Amino acid sequence: MSSRKIIHIDMDAFYASVELREQPHLKGRPVVVAWEGARSVICAASYEARQFGLHSAMSVATAKRLCPQAVYVPPHFDLYRQVSAQIHAVFRRYTDLIEPLSLDEAYLDVTRNFKNIPYASEVAKEIRAAIFAETGLTASAGIAPNKFLAKIASDWRKPNGQFVLPPHKVMAFLETLPLGKIPGVGKVTLKKMQSLGMRTAGDLRRFERGELLNHFGRYGYRLYDLVRGTDERPVKAERERLQISTEITLPEDLPLEQAAGHLPHLAEDLWRQITRKNVEAQSVTLKLKTYDFRIITRTLTYSSVLPDCAALLQAAQMLIARVPPQTEDAFRLIGIGVGHLVPKNQQQDLWA
């Protein structure tokens, strides 16, 4: 078992918590972050809203039936990005091995840390305290020998808690771990596992590598390692991007049409980034990740720059239409990005 010390930090109901911080009169009420509209989906739900069954990626229409008294606030991605930058500034006091997964979560490798703190649990405790002191927001943390285990552990004491999974306890922990807790195991995969008599990671561990390959394709190889607590992926420090992008990991695997419901707010977020960086783009890329971790991308390149957010959204929707429908496919991530960047006003042609 690895001797690394990995922390997974996950902010608690991040978007909703930022909105509640800005509008404290809403505290205690079910708050939903979403644009209102017939085809809109929830970006985030406060813990009070979750008690009514509301969650991100749910349609606003469904949410209003389940919780008519919920308060809806539009997302403010520029603000979320500012707060995320504050949080990352806290991380950098301890390590430069930081791998952001989104605005509200990241992996940190603190095996060697700037403060020479021997216990990763103490590092996590200090980081969470600093985040709260400087932003007023709470975070949960998982501490483990690798990224897979740290991510699972961060969910164990939510909200505003942390859970340590030391190497000598990993196998016992995994023996009874429900399969639905394994990242990437969504409804489709879980149903197949259950049909094979699997209920826990311990059950899955009793299958040979070849059997898992037959049942789950190449994802079977990864499952074989994960249920044995093996994950050698390093924490990859963020590097300068050659494109600008935004994406969302869905709380459950969704069919393509439902996943595409996130495109309007992704496009709006991405357009804000483009505007703030004072650049223009000539290509748009759609990224999808399936339940079994296959990556699907589609790209459109134009002879001139995108003129506005509506054109960006239109391009993303055209790319969705290029994804061949597969009845078994369910998606756990959707994102869009732009490339072929040029400084604003350098490209004068009209978009066509």
From Swiss-Prot:
Molecular function, one GO term: damaged DNA binding
The keyword Cytoplasm is assigned to this record: yes
Classification via CDD domains: PolY_Pol_IV_kappa (cd03586)
InterPro entries, alphabetized: DNA/RNA_pol_sf (IPR043502), DNA_pol_Y-fam_lit_finger_sf (IPR036775), DNA_pol_Y-fam_little_finger (IPR017961), DNA_polymerase-Y (IPR050116), DNApol_IV (IPR022880), IMS_HHH_1 (IPR053848), Rev_trsase/Diguanyl_cyclase (IPR043128), UmuC (IPR001126)
SUPFAM superfamilies hit by this protein: DNA/RNA polymerases (SSF56672), Lesion bypass DNA polymerase (Y-family), little finger domain (SSF100879)
GO BP terms, alphabetized: DNA-templated DNA replication; error-prone translesion synthesis; SOS response
Keyword Transport: no
UniProt site positions, description: Substrate discrimination: Y15
Compartments it resides in: Cytoplasm
Cofactor requirements of the protein: Mg(2+)
Domain spans labelled UmuC: 6-186
Active site: E105
Alphabetized UniProt keyword annotations: Cytoplasm, DNA damage, DNA repair, DNA replication, DNA-binding, DNA-directed DNA polymerase, Magnesium, Metal-binding, Mutator protein, Nucleotidyltransferase, Transferase
Cofactor: record remark: Binds 2 magnesium ions per subunit.
Binding site for Mg(2+): D10, D104
Entry similarity comment: Belongs to the DNA polymerase type-Y family.
Its job: Poorly processive, error-prone DNA polymerase involved in untargeted mutagenesis. Copies undamaged DNA at stalled replication forks, which arise in vivo from mismatched or misaligned primer ends. These misaligned primers can be extended by PolIV. Exhibits no 3'-5' exonuclease (proofreading) activity. May be involved in translesional synthesis, in conjunction with the beta clamp from PolIII.
Name of the protein this chain belongs to: DNA polymerase IV
Organism from which the protein derives: Neisseria meningitidis serogroup C / serotype 2a (strain ATCC 700532 / DSM 15464 / FAM18)
